[in-house]
Structure formats: structure tokens, C-alpha cells
Amino acid sequence: AYSWDNRVKYVVRYMYDIDNNGFLDKNDFECLALRNTLIEGRGEFNEAAYANNQKIMSNLWNEIAELADFNKDGEVTIDEFKKAVQNVCVGKAFATFPAAFKVFIANQFKTVDVNGDGLVGVDEYRLDCISRSAFANIKEIDDAYNKLATDADKKAGGISLARYQELYAQFISNPDESANAVYLFGPLKEVQ
């Protein structure tokens, strides 16, 4: 479940393919703009935040389409996305990622940091995990957090934005299945 191939499939399926049709298209990113606005506002709708999220997600879609829509049909398949990630991200640090990817990762952090304190603690990590997958035992989630977070993270009270960016970059760019970053989105299941 922690292979690079499965992790990239996981990102497509659970992070971007919000309409669950099996590929990425402009609609996914329009829906993500609204979703992120509501999560960031804890259910409150803010027009300015929505306009900002629409711009961010439109830019992200345009960049993903440019990098990954190899046949220019307006859809990015999992295989196309994997090829693009391999070309642009594998073996690279967060600082060298395309600008839209960096903005998306920072925004993703904001949706996980529900209390807005600048850290993702175990409580927020648990909420993030259960929003995408089914778990019957909290120990499974907590064990994953303990494998993800370093002693310094735990001492600070959670994972900072800079650390989250580093972990996200490793999640999609590092083929090493033993890296602690493989637990960024919780215990993973095999993506079909």
C-alpha cells in the first residue's frame, strides 16, 4: 500500500478526483475551490476566500493539464498524472516543485489545520484520515501519526507548514516505502 505507484494513485483518487469519475478534469478543481473554502471557513462561506480558492484551483488545473494531459483531451488519467509526477517531482525537493503544486500543498495544509494554529496535531490528523478512508480502530491512525511525526514535531505540538510541505514532497517524490512521509495521509489501503 505504500509503494510510490499506490501513493500517486491515492493522491489522484482521494485528493484531486473529488467527483470520483476516475480521472482529473476542470470540474474537480472547481469543486475543490468550494470544498476548500467551506473547510477553511469551518462551514461559513466567504466570497473573497472562494474567489481566491477559485483562482488557485484554476491555476492548479491549468498547470496539471499542461504537465499531464498528454493527449490534450481535457482529462488527466491516473497514468498520465503518474508520468507527469515522475517527470516533474520524483527525486526533487518541495522548493523545486511547480508553483501551482506548492500553492495546492499549502492550501491542503490549511484544510487539515482546522484550528488554525499553524500545526497539524494528532486530533487534526485523525479527522483528516477519516475524511477519506474507513477505520474501525483509532490505534491504526495513531500508529501512523507516530510513524510520521518526529520527536521534534511532537514536542512542537504537531507538524508545521514547512514540515508538511517537506513531507508532501517526499510522499509523491520519494520511491522509498520506508520513509516516514508515506504516512502523511494516514494508513493507506491499496488503490484499485
Swiss-Prot record:
Which Pfam families does this UniProt record tie to the protein? EF-hand_5 (PF13202), EF-hand_7 (PF13499)
Keyword Calcium present in the record's keywords: the answer is: yes
Query: Which residues hold Ca(2+) 2?
Result: 69, 71, 73, 75, 80
Q: Which residues form a coiled coil?
A: none
Domain EF-hand as annotated: residue spans = 4-39, 56-91, 100-135, 136-171
Keyword terms, alphabetized: Acetylation, Calcium, Metal-binding, Muscle protein, Repeat
Which of this chain's residues are annotated to bind Ca(2+) 1?
A: 17, 19, 21, 28
Q: By its UniProt entry, which InterPro entries does this protein fall under?
A: EF-hand-dom_pair, EF_Hand_1_Ca_BS, EF_hand_dom
Keyword Metal-binding on this protein? yes
Which residues are modified to N-acetylalanine?
Answer: 1
Q: What else is known?
A: The sarcoplasmic calcium-binding proteins are abundant in the muscle of arthropods, mollusks, annelids, and protochordates.
Q: What does this protein do?
A: Like parvalbumins, SCPs seem to be more abundant in fast contracting muscles, but no functional relationship can be established from this distribution.
- Subunit: SCPs from crayfish, lobster, and shrimp are polymorphic dimers.
Protein name, as recorded: Sarcoplasmic calcium-binding protein 1
Q: Per the UniProt entry, what species is this protein from, by scientific name?
A: Astacus leptodactylus (Turkish narrow-clawed crayfish)
